[in-house]
UniProtKB/Swiss-Prot annotation:
Keywords: DNA-binding, Nucleus. GO terms for cellular component: nucleus. InterPro entries: HMG_box_dom, HMG_box_dom_sf, SRY-related_HMG-box_TF-like. It comes from Eublepharis macularius (Leopard gecko). This is SRY-related protein LG28.
Length: 71
């Protein structure tokens, strides 16, 4: 069972692709840093759609109440 994505992960999935299209040689660590900075600059109102999508996590928790994340 996969771990559900939080709002940042939902948002960053698409944003990561955009960055990789523009700068295909950029290292993943640098992309992640940029994504983190950009997420912090977003207004709460801009994050709402991603927070709602991440609410799937609640359904996941209801469907799998004994789930424990193990990296």
């Amino acid at each position: 069972v996969k771990r559900p994505m939080n709002a940042f992960m939902v948002w960053s999935q698409n944003e990561r692709r955009k960055i990789m299209d523009q700068w295909p040689d950029m290292h993943n660590a640098e992309i992640s840093k940029r994504l983190g900075r950009r997420w912090q600059l977003l207004q709460d109102s801009e994050k709402i759609p991603f927070v709602k999508e991440a609410s799937v996590r609640l359904k996941h928790m209801a469907d799998y109440p004994d789930y424990k994340y193990r990296p």
